[in-house]
Amino acid sequence: MRSTKAIVAGSVFIFVVLFLLGLIYMFIAVGYNTLASDFSFLKEITGLFRYLVGIPVFMVTMFAGGYITASIANMQTYLKVWFHCLTVGLVTIGGMMYSALEYSSLTLTGIVVIILALSASSAGGFYWLRGNKINQ
């Protein structure tokens, strides 16, 4: 039962945080586009801005979700922690990609983001496990 709670809690945390960050990003993007209409050189870096800000914030959120999952599950082996964090990563990526890929195909950038997200959620769990083993 604790495993299920850990997976649900980690997934809900990631979904809620990314939803709120998405809203914040939309407000920033509207302001940026308004500013870019006056300064033409800003239009050229719009796509770069999305990747430079979005991917690191996404990875930090996935890391925190993996950390929360591992702390709630309270497992003491790397394999069990990795399984829980990987499950959270797959659930959240599946939920986000299902709506995004309804009428399109997966790109190389999407594959890289999926790999980074799974790595970040697993790293969050391993970070918790490392800190937990040191404190014992």
What are these regions (language model features)?
Residues 1-136:
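Juxtamembrane/disordered regions of integral membrane proteins
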